[in-house]
Amino acid sequence: MFLSPSAAMHDKILILDFGSQVTQLIARRVREAHVYCEIHPNDVSDDFVREFAPKGVILSGSHASTYEDHQLRAPQAVWDLGVPVLGICYGMQTMAVQLGGKVEWSDHREFGYAEVRAHGRTRLLDGIQDFATPEGHGMLKVWMSHGDKVGEMPPGFALMASTPSCPIAGMADEARGYYAVQFHPEVTHTVQGRKLLERFVLDIAGAKPDWIMRDHIEEAVARIREQVGDEEVILGLSGGVDSSVAAALIHRAIGDQLTCVFVDHGLLRLNEGKMVLDMFEGRLHAKVVHVDASEQFLGHLAGVADPEHKRKIIGREFVEVFQAEAKKLTNAKWLAQGTIYPDVIESGGAKTKKATTIKSHHNVGGLPETLGLKLLEPLRDLFKDEVRELGVALGLPAEMVYRHPFPGPGLGVRILGEVKRDYAELLRRADAIFIEELCGTLATEQDAAAGLCEPSQVGKSWYDLTSQAFAVFLPVKSVGVMGDGRTYDYVAALRAVQTTDFMTAHWAHLPYALLGRASNRIINEVRGINRVVYDVSGKPPATIEWE
């Protein structure tokens, strides 16, 4: 473990991860309060905790059982530091056990919405409520997810919250600044959760809200210059938000010492290559090496239908192409990557066996060892929304910074089954039409009246009102009629979702007129597609991408 440069320059909160699926949401809420924080595994050393010197500590939830598993505990240093501590779900239970309380099986497990009654006037919950009962008790609408519960509070703790099935749903030792809740304040389902976390971070822990992107640019530029000196840097430019912002930031710091390598694998969106080159060569005057490797990628993908196999082939071929180009740049000493904080967290989760792989990521993690280059990751402390904010501050156009996420393997995982050049071309055109209709259609008062959007969203484009939207190519044919003739062509599926964190997502309720126009245009303008369907699956159970 090592301290990041950002950790040394700001007040900070330490989040200890016990394996929850939503630990990243805790960090996002803290960052939204403009306070720097980092997530680290619960089994970090006492020395690391002391060196980190947090203003406060948050203990995450977990899929494990405190009642059964005596290994997942917070380091002793957490309790010796003398700083406020907030336990969430499992974090509450381990706080209870470690400080002398007891945890027991719950006869009634709680998963989903619940209403919690506040007790007393603790600093954490004072004045925070969703409604009051006729008797005047403050109530909170929260999200529960637990099978165990605290049966006996540790010495010094008082009851802070309860539900009928969980008599101790919150507890506090105000003298020591220890607070714990059985529910999850980090998820959006807990209505007052953001306010609760801000109360802990800003008021109780006393952290300064000085984590601001425009100031971060100056810090990052100075850090890059100090790291790199007069040496040269190479970066794989994909056109995605992360690599684009990383390139712009590094170019701001060292100018022509940076060379970007843009690999076209034949699976990009319509005109994506031109947009990237116009931006970085034309506007930023950065050095860009453009490699058309579409024949190589598509050749190796021929006959391959399995999604995992496709991802691995694309990742492998990217490494091969990038490596060949990098070797031509004999003066390069650094490899820059657009690694962001969720990547860092997920890598740590994999190492501690606390995370499950749903889909392989096609990153270039093996390149530094292969090429003998030092690694430069200027975005590794930032979440995606912070990366976008940084991109705007760096002067990148909004249409690039706020473009919807695009998978590393590109259209390769939006073409079901085998990838073929003609499939990719059909999909590119269908996708562009769908996105064009979303961008060109504004939400109306009628949409708001129908419940499709909020009144405050009237006048915004449906592209901005969706978190991710794209077309999928289905390698099946259906019968159609065009003019007086019979057609037998392929099917395109349209997918649009709305989400705050991409961990869960709802399918977007788009206006029928918009969907109708997109469908008609695709069928009429993309020869080879004669049917369009709309995906109405949420996440879970479906994933956002089809493969």
Swiss-Prot record:
Signal peptide: none
GO molecular-function term, one example from the UniProt record: ATP binding
Keyword entries, A-Z: ATP-binding, Glutamine amidotransferase, GMP biosynthesis, Ligase, Nucleotide-binding, Purine biosynthesis
E.C. numbers: 6.3.5.2
A Gene Ontology term for the protein's cellular component: cytosol
Pathway: Purine metabolism; GMP biosynthesis; GMP from XMP (L-Gln route): step 1/1
Reactions it catalyzes: XMP + L-glutamine + ATP + H2O = GMP + L-glutamate + AMP + diphosphate + 2 H(+)
Domain GMPS ATP-PPase: 211-403
List of residues binding ATP: 238-244
Enzyme class: ligase
Top-level taxonomic group: Bacteria
Domain (Glutamine amidotransferase type-1) ranges: 12-210
Active-site residues, Swiss-Prot/TrEMBL: 89 (nucleophile), 184, 186
Protein function: Catalyzes the synthesis of GMP from XMP.
Record note on quaternary structure: Homodimer.
Protein's name according to its UniProt entry: GMP synthase [glutamine-hydrolyzing]
Originating organism: Burkholderia pseudomallei (strain K96243)
